[in-house]
Amino acid sequence: MKCSKYLIALGLAVSACSSSGSSAPTSLTLVTYDSFPTKDSGVNTALAEFTASTGITVRIVTAGDAGTMVSKATLTTGTPEGDVMWGVDNTLLSAATEGRVFDGSPTEVDHGDVCVNYDIAWFAKHGVTPPQSFDDLVKPEYKDLLVVEDASASSTGLAFLLGTIAHSGERWTDYWKALKSNGAEIADSWDTAYYQRFSGAGGSKGDKPLVVSYGTSPPAEVVFANPPRTDAPTGVAASTCFRQIEYAGVLRGTKHSKAAKRLVEFFRSDRFQRELPLSLFVNPVDPKTSLPDVFTKFGVVPADSLTIDPATIAAKRQGWQDQWHQIMVG
């Protein structure tokens, strides 16, 4: 999930003392999206413990939104800027595979849902019922209220596009034409949409009460609320949720393949997985991992999230994005 303003993201490295007896510890570079925390979070503490037990230091390099990150990685395939990549999702996995970004197959590390979020206070103030479905979003009462991310550049935007395709089928282009006519605004990234345009985000001065975000955005608003609060200021239109699965993998061309594989294996460990809910606001891939109360109380994990077969995404993603761009941008 994107949560860059929920987390302090200014540092560049996570390191600790190497284990005793290791004369030449390995340093790995982890390439990830901008919202991955670089210090002061549970995942950083877990990475420091990984370093202490293995002698392998981990330097974090952020590379933009997941879509931008994958695009950069395909341009440097074979001579990567790092050793391991975190955050390629199921909407972009085919692009990474076609670009031969990874050495072997990447590993599933977490999942979440891309959904429409709404500002509870705004709708209460205006006496309007929040939308609950894709069909609601094109109704007159929601005109000029929604901001969505660029589906040709943002992984969040692409996931929402795929959700509309799963919902509308072959008539998805008509749906987007209706969304455009109903005043849907396009933002270049999730950060811009959520923190600058959405009225429900903490500290935001935006005026859009509807935004494409995540089913786990409400608990993040509670955790990082200032002043503290015990209720979520935002809600989720659960019928609009599209399942997003994130992967991590060893980058093809790394000079530290064995150490890189150890790091990817560590990502699947309980020690790392249990830090994901309150560090990245995503669900651990291991269903046995315990979840914090605030995460389960305010987060939304639909039992029937929309999905599209990965092979279909691989075959049609670029064409869908091109059609979307023609409709929404021209």
Could you say what each language-model-derived stretch is?
Residues A13-A16:
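C-terminal motif of bacterial Sec signal peptides marking the signal peptidase cleavage site
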Residues A24-A95:
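Early extracytoplasmic/lumenal segment of secretory-pathway proteins
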Residues P80-M85, G99-Y118, F134-D136, D144-A151:
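A structural signal for short loop-to-beta-strand junctions that line the ligand-binding cleft
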Residues N90-R100, E108-T129, G157-H167, R243-G249:
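Periplasmic solute-binding protein
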Residues D103-V109, D135-V138, V223-F242, L251-G253:
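Short beta-strand->loop
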Residues G163-T240:
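Ligand-binding pocket segment of bilobal, Venus flytrap-like solute-binding proteins
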Residues L251-T307:
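Mature extracytoplasmic/periplasmic domains
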